[in-house]
Amino acid sequence: MSDEEAAVVEAAQVATAAYCAGDTDAFLPYIHPERTTFGPDGGRLASFDAAALRAGMAAGSVQAQVEWEGLQATIHDNVAVSTGYLVGTWTIGGDTREGRWRETIVWLRGGGGWQVSHLHVSECLA
């Protein structure tokens, strides 16, 4: 793994740890302001809403206790793609599920480092 790929993997791990800790101040710098998501709830394409995330985490209706498995990254100039599995529990809208999810992230490199531009999470059935 190259140093650049390792930096993206580390960004994913640090951002996920902040999310799991409910630390939005540590999580949000990793999120591009125009991020889109296909989330773990199986819903339609959604734009990121930082205020909704903060409110959901404060209320306990949005939370996760997940860990990465098989996380890897590929770099294409100022764009990176990371893929891996998240294993554990995820609560969205008060509905808690345990399992394994496939996650693909498109990252953009900017002045502040790597930020998530698009995230696709889906349940792994295999």
State the predicted function of each range.
Residues E5-A11, T24-H76:
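A solvent-exposed, acidic/Ser-Thr-rich amphipathic alpha-helical stretch
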Residues A15, L53-R54, W68-A73, Y85-G88, ...:
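Hydrophobic/aromatic beta-strand elements that line small-molecule binding cavities or substrate pockets
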Residues S61, T89-E98:
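Short, cysteine-centered beta-strand-loop-beta hairpins and adjacent loop/turn segments enriched
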Residues A64, D77-G88:
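A short hydrophobic beta-strand element
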Residues E98-A126:
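Short beta-strand edge/turn micro-motifs at domain boundaries
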